[in-house]
Amino acid sequence: MAVAAASPWHENHEAAFDALAASRPGIVAHAAVETYSALTRMPEPNRMHPAEALLFLDDWFEDRWIGLSAAAQRLLLGRFSAAGIHGGATYDALIGATTAAEGATLVTADRRALVTYALVGADVELVA
């Protein structure tokens, strides 16, 4: 959602921007780092300057970054393994499990990850 909200050229930009603007969103710390990485590595002309990507994250999410302790993340791997979560879905599971642990709603346009989010007990709002 954050990449789409920050990127006027993105197909889900309007829905993502509106979803963020309608609330006081938080962001999973890992997802913030992924967002910064994605925004600053896009091919030109869509690539953001690092300072611009940081400003976006600061403006939209301020001090509302959430995350799990290292010990909690370590324990998650057992849950992921038992649930059959592996590969790239592991990162979706981390985001979902973090929002679930915080009692937050995960706002996403990523239909691909919905099963993974359900497996870790995330409350999900699908946008777009």
Language-model features: locations:
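Alpha-helix/helix-capping structural signal
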Residues: 1, 111-112
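Generic alpha-helical structural context detector
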Residues: 1-4, 37-40, 58, 78
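Short, well-structured N-terminal submotif of metal-dependent ribonuclease cores
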Residues: 1-28, 43-52, 120
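PIN/NYN-family metal-dependent endoribonuclease catalytic core
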Residues: 17-45, 60, 64-70
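Histidine- and aromatic-rich ligand-binding microenvironments
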Residues: 27-29, 88-89, 110, 125-128
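Active-site neighborhoods of divalent-metal-dependent phosphate/nucleic-acid chemistry enzymes
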Residues: 63-111
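Short loop/helix-cap segments at secondary-structure boundaries that form the rim of catalytic
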Residues: 114-120
